[in-house]
Amino acid sequence: SAAGYLLQTFFANPIAGPFVMGISSGAKLAVALVMVVFLNHGLLTSSLTLITAAFAGAMASMAFVLAVSRRVQRMSILVICGVMIGYICSAVTEFVVAFAQDSNIVNLHNWSQGSFSGMTWGNVRAAALVVLPALAAAFCLSKPMAAYQMGEAYARSVGINVKAFSRLLVLLSSLLAACVTAFAGPISFVGIAVPHLVKQLFGSARPLVVLPGCCLGGAAFCLLCDLIARSMFAPTELSISSVTAVFGAPVVIWLLVHRQSGEGRA
């Protein structure tokens, strides 16, 4: 959810997020490729290897989105391109999973749909080594983010190096999204819905308020959805993305309708 908030700040778009912009899907494809290659050769994948692969995939997708953003003026077209990237990466991931050995297909399929069931304390420690410094860096950028939200011209007027700041936002958002995807697979709508729910709850859009709220709110939201996914139809376990979509998609619909009605009144 923190990655989603950073992307919403960077693109100035309320529905930007790792899943919608295709970043999570790019990370998923890279991790799936590494896992299939390693597993088919009887090798073990370390946490660092998965994080590195996910980050490379996330940055590749992000690079494509940024290239498209320079050619289009309408943000809606950029979002559609991001969604298409996600579909392409997901389709290629399915082809990759098809080449996995039979004993590994179930685990790979569950991971590719989004699941916390394969997480271990070793994974948590490895992710924490990356996520905590990234979040600390994001907190340090709170004041520049507040200025950037007022517009690039205003940010430059107060002495912010917009180009370097934008690169940091891209790097941090991709890194945070990659860490989650490396171990839990792509989890939809958390990065979009939670930042807006936090803003509504606290009645503030200040980064110093929203960022910690996203961290705590995203964790609570995912825990609740994971509990529902595991217990609602036990012993059958749903993918966590299917549950987050049930709660997150209405928030996105509300955002689109609210934004359209606001433009209509203007």
Regions found by a protein language model. Name each.
Residues 1-266:
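Alpha-helical transmembrane segments in inner-membrane proteins
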